[in-house]
Amino acid sequence: MRLTELALRRAGAADLEEFQRREGLYPSGQEDILTMQRLTPLLLGYERYMVKPGDTYYRIATARGTSVRAMLTANPNQNPNLLIPGQYLNVPYGFPVVPADVPFSSELLQICVQGLLVRYPFLSQKCIARTAWGRPVTALRSGQGPRCALYNASHHANEWITTPVLLPFLEQYASA
């Protein structure tokens, strides 16, 4: 499955033209810049939202199909009782970042990592190596305690098996 197809499925659109019409874009059926800008948040699992006068976490969460808890997690340095019009918030969507039913690619892995880091800012990322093709080998970390556990996935020849198991596990752990 292509990334565009995943984003369209998450948007509930049958094809690009339907999505473009719904978004008020010219329905060309092509992956143009404006269309991809609107589809990208659906892949990342969150959107950047500019606060408007009268907004509350509850109103924003309800309008976007998410929870106040998810917004609090994604915006740890924001005071939910002091929203200032014009400031930006990360608003997680009400679905998991990590798709459970699509084949993983290096590109999809990096998109999932980006989304997880924003939705769960207590996670951190480090590039520990590069593949022969120059792609990053990413390590994700949660917590800072004295105990350490390593879970390994997305390594050569097994990424299609291990990544779809480990990443949803990490997302469930982070959201707990």
Predicted regions and their residues:
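M14 metallocarboxypeptidase catalytic domain recognition
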Residues: 2, 10-14, 18-176
